């Protein structure tokens, strides 16, 4: 491999990836940077591509949309970082100036690009190009390991976003009196639990069918509910502590219809469901169900 090439994980279609030599990316526009990757995460949405659950128009792109690394090249218009800085990147590129960015909805930026997609190569490679760097990457605080920093690229912010949205739906209710449920205790679900606990709710239930995940959730401070015992037992446990009303807020982190249906079954009237799982099937309840 020459000094102008790098190794990269390339997606060619469902169940078809390859490690290949690709040219090291260069700055193409004044607001670009190039990052030497030191850590790159594997997201559940990468598995959606791999398993064929999410169809792409064309393949041959480098995967990976959450990463940490060192800036090695910067365009002349970049002002917030410079070569030598360690940075953390979210999964999308954003401009910082459009309608959505100003509302802090940067994932819907009018100039949005997703790393690891047809439009923009990702970071499961030795180097990655980052457009619109000033409004996309964040300089990493000193003293944190790559293992800690990589959580802040996508995993923790997604869990935090889900918990924050669920708690925002409480309205006038005191958060410390709320009963919160997190469905799914994988990495993002555990981060949602940590985030929900910051609101000091009366109880946070954690639902999963994997014993080790339930154990981690319990260590964090959640009350585990084992899905293997059946949904009726979960409904009963939630109703027992809410005088039969149901949960005040639910964060659904699985991305499957049955999980979203469980959220619907355990939420109280006027409760808040925050669904951050990546869904590929029809809604498991109707508008009529919601009205009733």
Swiss-Prot record:
InterPro entries: ADH-like_C, ADH-like_N, ADH_Zn_CS, GroES-like_sf, NAD(P)-bd_dom_sf. Binds 1 zinc ion per subunit. Substrate binds at residue 49. One of its GO terms (molecular function) is oxidoreductase activity. It is an enzyme of class 1 (oxidoreductase). Medium chain reductase/dehydrogenase; part of the gene cluster that mediates the biosynthesis of UCS1025A, a member of the pyrrolizidinone family that acts as a strong telomerase inhibitor and displays potent antibacterial and antitumor properties. These compounds share a hemiaminal-containing pyrrolizidinone core fused with a gamma-lactone, giving a furopyrrolizidine that is connected to a decalin fragment. This is Medium chain reductase/dehydrogenase ucsI.
